[in-house]
Amino acid sequence: MAKSDYYEILGISKNADEREIKKSYKRLAMKFHPDRNPGNTTAETKFKEIKEAYEVLSNSEKRAAYDQYGHAAFESGSMGATSNSGGADFSDIFGDVFGDIFGGNRRSRAGRGSDLRYNIELSLEDAVRGIIKEICIPTLSTCEKCRGTGARSNAAIITCMTCHGQGQVQIRQGFFSVQQSCPTCHGHGKIIKEACNKCHGNGRVERSKTLSVKIPSGVNTGDRIRLSGEGESGKNGAPSGDLYVQIQIRKHPIFDREEKNLYCEVPISFSMAALGGEIEVPTLDGRVKLKIPPETQTGKLFRMRGKGVKSVRSGGNGDLLCRVVVETPVKLNDIQKRLLQDLSDSFEGPHGNRNSPRSKSFFDGVKKFFDDLTR
C-alpha cells in the first residue's frame, strides 16, 4: 500500500519552514498521542505516521533526500548492526520536541507500565451525589527484594557487549543510519546473569492494592476517571501506567436518565385528570408537591426545574420531567359502574362533543378517510 505524503500528514506546504513543521507536529502529536487515546488503534497508527513524517522533515538532509526521491530514499538497504558510535543519532528527535508536553522521552517510556481498567457500578443516587469508593485491583508492582532490577544482586548485572550499555544499535536504512532497540539486551543496556529468586528476573511481582476513588457528582455511564500512575509498575525504573475507572450506572426502579435530566411516570386517577388536584412526586431530594390542572391528558409532561442531575462538566443542574399516566379504574362495584355509566350517558347529549374534543376530531378524520375511499 502506498505511503502517505509526509507534508500532507503534517498538514503543511512543501515550502514550510522549521518553525511551521515543529508547530504542526506538536499540535497533531498532542491530539493523537496514545496517552490521550488509550485503546484507540486508529489514533495510534496516525500518531506513528505523524512521528515518522516529523523525523524526516525536521532534518535538513533527510528532507532534501525525500524531496528528491520520495519514500524510495528510505527503503531498506544493508542491515548491518553496529554499536552506538559514529553516524547520525536520530533517537532523541521525538523526545526533545515532545518531552516538554508529556514529560520524559522515548527511552524512558519504552518500559512504561501497562494501563489498567476497572469497571465500577454505581447506583443513580451515588452517581448524582458523588461518593468515595474503595476498590481492590490486581496489578504488577516493583519487586521489593531487587528493587525492580530483576537481579539477585548488583554484581549479577553486567553491561551489554552488543550495544555497550546504550540499549540501542544503529541500522543502515537507505541513505541513513537509524536506531532501534538492542536485540541482545532488548533496550535495557544491561544483562542479568543471576535472576532475583522472588520475581525471577522480571523486576515486578503480582499483588493486589486497595485504592480510594473519589467519584465526582454527576457522572454517567461511559464516563472514565483516570488515576495517573496507578497502573502497572514500569520496568527498570520506567514510569507506571495509569488506571482508568469506567463508570456504569445501574437501572433505577423509578427514574430514567438522559444526560442532566431525569424522567419518571406518575399515575393519576381518572377523576384527578378531569378535575385537577395535587399529588406528591418523588425526587432524589425527597417528595415534592405537583399541581395537576383540570382536563390533564395522559402523556402530559410537567417539568420541575433544578430537580435533575448536576452536570459533572458545566456544574448546572438538570430538570425532572414527570409524565402523567391516567389510570383506568379496575374492580368496580355495582354502584361505581352505575355512576360511570350515568357519566358516560351524559356525554352522549347535544354537548357531548365538547367533553371529548380529541375523540371527535379523530373519528371525524376516520369518517372522511373512508368517505374518500368510496368516492
From Swiss-Prot:
The gene it comes from is dnaJ
Q: Which HAMAP family does this entry report, sorted A to Z?
A: DnaJ
GO MF annotation, one: heat shock protein binding
Its protein name is: Chaperone protein DnaJ
Which keywords does this Swiss-Prot/TrEMBL entry list? Chaperone, Cytoplasm, DNA replication, Metal-binding, Repeat, Stress response, Zinc, Zinc-finger
Where does the record place its CXXCXGXG motif repeats?
143-150, 160-167, 182-189, 196-203
Residues that hold Zn(2+) 2 according to the record = 160, 163, 182, 185
> Which NCBIfam families does this UniProt record tie to the protein?
DnaJ_bact, PRK10767.1
The record describes the protein's role as: Participates actively in the response to hyperosmotic and heat shock by preventing the aggregation of stress-denatured proteins and by disaggregating proteins, also in an autonomous, DnaK-independent fashion. Unfolded proteins bind initially to DnaJ; upon interaction with the DnaJ-bound protein, DnaK hydrolyzes its bound ATP, resulting in the formation of a stable complex. GrpE releases ADP from DnaK; ATP binding to DnaK triggers the release of the substrate protein, thus completing the reaction cycle.
- Show the InterPro entries listed in the entry: DnaJ, DnaJ_C, DnaJ_domain, DnaJ_domain_CS, HSP40/DnaJ_pept-bd, HSP_DnaJ_Cys-rich_dom, HSP_DnaJ_Cys-rich_dom_sf, J_dom_sf
Q: Which domain of life is it from?
A: Bacteria
Give the location in the cell.
Cytoplasm
Q: Which classification does the entry list for the species?
A: Bacteria, Pseudomonadati, Pseudomonadota, Gammaproteobacteria, Enterobacterales
Q: Name one GO biological process term.
A: response to heat
Q: Member of which family?
A: Belongs to the DnaJ family.
Which comment does the entry carry about domains? The J domain is necessary and sufficient to stimulate DnaK ATPase activity. Zinc center 1 plays an important role in the autonomous, DnaK-independent chaperone activity of DnaJ. Zinc center 2 is essential for interaction with DnaK and for DnaJ activity.
